[in-house]
Amino acid sequence: MFLDKLGVDKSNWSELFSACVGKATLLQKRAFKLLVEGSNWQVDFDSSKIYFDGREFDMQFIGSESFSSNTWLWGYENINGFDERLLELANKAREFGEKFGLSAFSKPQFELDENFNGHTISMILCTAFDEQNYYRIEYEGGAAYVAFRSDVIFEEPVLANELLSIVNECISSYELDHKIFIKGLLLSCGIKFSESPNEIVSDKYELSFKFDELNRLINILSKL
């Protein structure tokens, strides 16, 4: 688990999200471009499969949002009586939450808000465990979230312009610990870096990220 190498507080939702959101955003963008966009999709919960234009992938059920009660319900509660094979990832989340005191993972049901919802939960879960993608399936009264893994998403190396695009998008969209975010993105992408109190320099692409005393990103230098 790359979180071990990163050294974040696994009981701290903000640190976990900061560490995972970069890679999750990158994977979701790649999946949309390579698989989802313009595709006909189909889900088979009995066989634990998801299909995009006939391409088949193993699937895990994460959980669901209820529009009427505005709540999240974890898949490990298994109110639908799914095969346990479909719930392995959700059960890992529960074990993680119980071990590290992360209530968003260990509490079966809770109210949704901008910080705790299907998207943010799936981003952390799919990046922390196996770097999978997730897909949102909306239905009458709610939405289900499922995870899947496709090797095609990982075939192309992460380019500098792709990396910088993710940095700009995430920092403008979420409240993050910028330093944890940059380190998490680089580490989860397999990009080595060196670190000083106010700067992170990636060995690849000669990128320099500079921070103020509050870990806020104040400058990016690149030779692009």
Residue ranges and their predicted role:
Residues 46-48, 70, 141-142, 196-199, ...:
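Beta-strand-connecting loop/turn residues
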Residues 1-91, 95:
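N-terminal leader/presequence regions that precede the main folded/catalytic core
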Residues 27-35, 113-129, 181-192, 199-202:
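Short, solvent-exposed secondary-structure boundary motifs
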Residues 51-56, 77-79, 149-152, 201-206, ...:
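Secondary-structure transition/turn motif
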Residues 79-176:
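Surface-exposed beta-loop interaction hotspot
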Residues 33-45, 137, 191-195, 199-200, ...:
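Short, exposed beta-strand/loop patches in secreted or surface proteins that constitute
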Residues 158-224:
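Alpha-helical oligomerization segments
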Residues 54-64, 147-148, 207-212:
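Short amphipathic beta-strand/extended segments with alternating polar/hydrophobic composition
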